[in-house]
Structures are given as structure tokens and as C-alpha cells.
Amino acid sequence: MLFATLEHILTHISFSTISIVITIHLITLLVRELRGLRDSSEKGMIATFFSITGFLVSRWVSSGHFPLSNLYESLIFLSWTLYILHTIPKIQNSKNDLSTITTPSTILTQGFATSGLLTEMHQSTILVPALQSQWLMMHVSMMLLSYATLLCGSLLSAALLIIRFRNSFDFFSLKKNVLRKTFFFSEIEYLYAKRSALKNTSFPVFPNYYKYQLTERLDSWSYRVISLGFTLLTVGILCGAVWANEAWGSYWNWDPKETWAFITWTIFAIYLHSRTNPNWKGTNSALVASIGFLIIWICYFGINLLGIGLHSYGSFTLPSK
């Protein structure tokens, strides 16, 4: 009872905090001068991280196993992973382009886990025999880490496509449209303002130079993040194959989850291969990564909706009483 109460408090603290953070984040996109608010949003992300970490530790202690046995726990772990990705640029002392991706992703994941699932699905369950293995932590954590990383990389690629083609659609060309102030559009305005200030200098500045700088940075970040995610996905699939051989006597069974994991791996392998061709860099490779975004959600959620196959214990079915 004590652990259940603690988990309830921590999940709602983390969700409330991240909701405030995303509000502050949107305000700072609209008003760049409010630097104090930007610092507050970072402190809020730290508070969210510790709340989610506290929940995972509490669930681990109370259940006696790593908290990755059902959809609810995996979503909480996914939001925790997104925060880890949020901190990587800060560790490297580089511009945090990922924050515009990771912050909304964290609140959506946390919000769905907290409010979108039935309360009965929040309960910790006894592991089925197939999950009573040390491979649980290695395989499932690697898969969720890869999902979070690949989703962020795919969204960066989608941002690149939106920025490059926004002038092709009247929806994006409206000067007062709110979308200009979200995602990376505020960065574009800053770069264009900077370009205007340099008009009277002797340096050559062509019209789309700063927009080009931004898209190149997005392309670079997307490639680096997806490369990391692809590595994690490969490790996760290999761990799952070894575990499957121990549990079911076969490395690969073409279970629906396994099939879509293979499709996901193939899509991002194509993305990485396309990067070796200069003609496919940028827009074309970003298109492949954007397709991968949809494939990941099919692999993670779509198969769970069906509730069939060897991975049915991760479905939306309610725990047995």
C-alpha cells in the first residue's frame, strides 16, 4: 500500500511538472528575452526526471523485478529515456536542438501513461514464466531505448522536411501562423534577423544561408541520433533472439512483434545506407526516417492493440485478478 501511494504521488508530480515545463517552453519560444523562464523549464525537467526515477525504483522494489512487464511500465520507462536524450546535448555543452523534440514527447508519453490507460493497467503484475529471466532488463530496456532514440531522430528529420517545404504550402506561409513560433520556426526567425543585421557588412550572405545552416544542423543531429538508435535496436533484437532461444527453443519465430521489429530495423538500415549516397542526403533520407517514425509506432503500439503472438503479455489486456 505504501509503495502504491508513493508511485501514485510520483507519477502525478512528474506529469504536473512536465505540463508546466511544456507551457514555459512554449512561452520562451514566443518571447526570447525571458531567459529566467528558460532556466525554470530546465529545473522542471530535472524534477520530472527524479520523479520518474523514483517511480521506477519504487516499482522495482515493490514488484521484485525490473519495471518493464506491461505497457504502463514501458511507457513510464520510455518517458524516462526521453529525458536522458534531453540531457545529452547539455553534457556535450552544445546547443540543445533536441529539447524541442524531447520535451513535448515526454509530456505526451507521460500523459498517455497516466491518464490514457485504465487504472487497472497501472497495477504491477506477476511475471509470466517467459519473462522470468535476466534477459528481461537487457532486451526490453534496449528496445525501449532504441524506440525513444529513433523517434527523436525521426522527428528531427520531419522538422527538416517541414522547414524545407513549408513555403510550398499556404498553411505554412502565413506570417502570423502559430506554427512559426513552435518547433524550430522561432530559430529560423532568429537566423533571418541575424541575416538582416549583416546586410551592410562585407561578408557575402545569400538569401537562404541561415535557413541552410539550420537544416544542415538538423540533418546532422538526426543522423547522429538515428545512428545511436539503430545500434541500440540491433543490440535489443540480438538479445531478444538469444532470450527466445532459451525460452522457446528458437532464435526467431516471425511473431508479429518480431516481424515489425525487423521491418523497423530494415527501414533505418535503408536510411543509414542512403546517407552514403550524396544525392540521397538531406531531403530523401529525411523522408525515409519520417516513414520510420510511423513504423516504430506500429511496432510498439499497433501490435499491442492486436494482443496476439508471443509478445501478447505487453498488450492492452487488463491484468488478471
Swiss-Prot record:
InterPro entries: Cyt_c_assembly (IPR002541), Cyt_c_biogenesis_CcsA (IPR017562), Cyt_c_biogenesis_CcsA/CcmC (IPR045062). Pfam families: Cytochrom_C_asm (PF01578). The chain crosses the membrane at residues 9-29, 44-64, 68-88, 143-163, 225-245, 259-273, 288-308. Keywords: Chloroplast, Cytochrome c-type biogenesis, Membrane, Plastid, Thylakoid, Transmembrane, Transmembrane helix. GO terms for molecular function: heme binding. May interact with Ccs1. Required during biogenesis of c-type cytochromes (cytochrome c6 and cytochrome f) at the step of heme attachment. Belongs to the CcmF/CycK/Ccl1/NrfE/CcsA family. This is Cytochrome c biogenesis protein CcsA. The gene is ccsA.
